[in-house]
């Protein structure tokens, strides 16, 4: 799998896809959606789709695809290579979302939470398959959040397609299992070949599973936190585990626009037009304070 685009710039997202098998342009197809790396505090999250004609579903099942979490890394690599060999009837596509993208989405002024990001990424991949000309008739999705709500949303988005959203879909439907293998192979490769742009001293890659409750992962985070700049971009700053370590290990930051003289928040809009005295002190901007400048009330 060629992840060179991500390796050149691992701050955003990248999409990869196989060639579309000609048979998938003609015959009705079944498509599965799954992800890898939703929970870890380290590394990217990868969403993947896999699809094949309904008439060849038994051939996909014959590959012995299974939930990627039940397979070893070598088994996943072997099955993905087999799907690549069977490219005359199996197609796939994936979206790799960097830790930096996830963190900036979740911590932005307008919050974009992980569920919304996941839903939109999955929807985008289904639309990508349709745009490529794949004749999608059925879609099976491993749920994020309530399956009923998610299914209703997807069904409204794709009214001409039969949509099924289930928990543990990767263990129930072979086409979702195949998607989970694609996603996991891509994430494993991205993590293994991650390019650290930061100049870290004594960098080690023994960070355990990457999950927040892994002691080895926590130890790696504490070792590689900078007291001023925080973590390298390999880390999802928006995870509570990372935030807790920043609070205990890094320097406190006081922003220029921090509330200082208005602990009760902004007053009512009418107060700006009334003659009554202000109940709290409004400090001028630092530029005026440093230069000893004050508002002139009498000329």
From Swiss-Prot:
GO terms for cellular component: cytosol; nucleoplasm; ribonuclease H2 complex. InterPro entries: RNase_H2_suA, RNase_HII/HIII, RNase_HII/HIII_dom, RNase_HII_hlx-loop-hlx_cap_dom, RNaseH-like_sf, RNaseH_sf. Pfam families: RNase_HII. It comes from the Eukaryota. Its cofactor is Mn(2+); Mg(2+). Its EC number is 3.1.26.4. The modification N-acetylmethionine is found at residue 1. The modification Phosphothreonine is found at residues 205, 217. One of its GO terms (molecular function) is RNA binding. Disulfide bonds: none annotated. CDD domains: RNase_HII_eukaryota_like. It is found in: Nucleus. Manganese or magnesium. Binds 1 divalent metal ion per monomer in the absence of substrate. May bind a second metal ion after substrate binding. A divalent metal cation binds at residues 34-35, 142. Keywords: Acetylation, Endonuclease, Hydrolase, Metal-binding, Nuclease, Nucleus, Phosphoprotein. PANTHER family: RIBONUCLEASE H2 SUBUNIT A. The RNase H2 complex is a heterotrimer composed of the catalytic subunit RNASEH2A and the non-catalytic subunits RNASEH2B and RNASEH2C. Catalytic subunit of RNase HII, an endonuclease that specifically degrades the RNA of RNA:DNA hybrids. Participates in DNA replication, possibly by mediating the removal of lagging-strand Okazaki fragment RNA primers during DNA replication. Mediates the excision of single ribonucleotides from DNA:RNA duplexes. This is Ribonuclease H2 subunit A. It comes from Bos taurus (Bovine). The lineage of its organism: Eukaryota, Metazoa, Chordata, Craniata, Vertebrata.
């Amino acid at each position: 799998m060629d992840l060179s685009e991500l390796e050149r710039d691992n701050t955003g997202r990248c999409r990869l896809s196989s060639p579309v098998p000609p048979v998938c342009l003609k015959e009705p197809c079944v498509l599965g959606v799954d992800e890898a790396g939703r929970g870890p505090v380290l590394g990217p999250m990868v969403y993947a789709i896999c699809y094949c004609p309904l008439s060849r579903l038994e051939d996909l099942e014959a590959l012995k695809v299974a939930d990627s979490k039940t397979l070893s890394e070598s088994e996943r690599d072997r099955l993905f290579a087999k799907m690549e060999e069977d490219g005359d009837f199996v197609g796939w596509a994936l979206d790799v979302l960097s830790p930096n993208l996830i963190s900036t989405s979740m911590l932005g002024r307008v919050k974009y939470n992980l569920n919304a990001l996941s839903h939109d990424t999955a929807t985008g991949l289904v639309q990508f398959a349709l745009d490529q000309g794949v004749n999608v008739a059925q879609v099976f999705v491993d749920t994020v959040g309530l399956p009923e709500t998610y299914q209703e949303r997807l069904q409204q988005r794709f009214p001409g397609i039969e949509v099924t959203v289930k928990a543990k879909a990767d263990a129930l439907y072979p086409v979702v299992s195949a998607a989970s293998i694609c996603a996991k192979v891509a994430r494993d490769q991205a993590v293994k070949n991650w390019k650290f742009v930061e100049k870290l001293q004594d960098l080690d890659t023994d960070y355990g599973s990457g999950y927040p409750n892994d002691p080895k992962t926590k130890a790696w985070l504490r070792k590689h936190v900078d007291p001023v700049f925080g973590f390298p971009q390999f880390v999802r700053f928006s995870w509570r585990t990372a935030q807790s370590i920043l609070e205990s290990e890094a320097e406190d930051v006081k922003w220029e626009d921090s509330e200082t003289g208005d602990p009760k928040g902004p007053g009512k809009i009418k107060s700006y037009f009334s003659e009554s005295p202000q109940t709290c002190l409004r400090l001028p901007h630092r530029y005026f304070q440093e230069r000893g400048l004050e508002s002139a009330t009498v000329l």
